[in-house]
Amino acid sequence: MTNFHKLLLAMAIAALISAPALAQQSAPKPLPPTNAPASAAAQAAASIAAPQIEAQTIDGKPFTLAAFKGKVVLVMFWSTGCAVCRDKMPELRTNYEGWAGKPFEVVAISTDAVMQDALDYERIISRTVPMKQRFVQIWAGSPGYKDNLGKHAMLPAAYLLNKDGKVVERYVGRIPAEAWVKISDLL
């Protein structure tokens, strides 16, 4: 490993460690739950009855969201440059592991400008995170990537799908604690 790679790895680890502190300084507010009066964003999420995603995972496997029908799915758009996004990853992994054996999946879609950023992050994570905490990782710029969820002006942006594949909640910014209760109820 060259000195440059060691420096890059040290910087990435430092960024991961400092992410919670940075995220608390500028955490955007989540959208209200769907049982609240419908905002424009909530109405937009509800208008996407059955999202469709077709892609290759970052390890080259074909992926289609339709394969997860019958499961509760949390689809999160994120970026390695987003402190709030990186801050949420350990929470996502912990809950994913906690619901192992239940019909629950997480799909993380990196919106990084270049795939190498997502690959570098995954390489670091693969050294520290057990396999049972790993979920589907996709890069939105990969050849053949398609989704009908549109562009995301703010990250993270997450969609909660019920077992019928319909959007029941949309979150922008931090995923609130109530989201985990909602997921538990859907399971």
Predicted regions and their residues:
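Short, internal strand/loop/helix patches
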Residues: 122-159
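Thiol-/selenol-based redox modules, centered on thioredoxin-like
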Residues: 29-31, 154-187
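Short pre-active-site segment immediately N-terminal to redox-active cysteine/selenocysteine motifs
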Residues: 71-73, 78-81, 154
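Bacterial N-terminal signal peptides
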Residues: 8-19
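N-terminal "domain-start" segment that seeds a small globular fold
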Residues: 26-65, 133
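Boundary at the C-terminal end of the N-terminal hydrophobic targeting segment
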Residues: 21-23
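Conserved redox-active cysteine motifs that mediate thiol-disulfide chemistry
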Residues: 77-94
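Thiol-based oxidoreductase modules, predominantly thioredoxin-like and allied folds used
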Residues: 103-117, 131-142
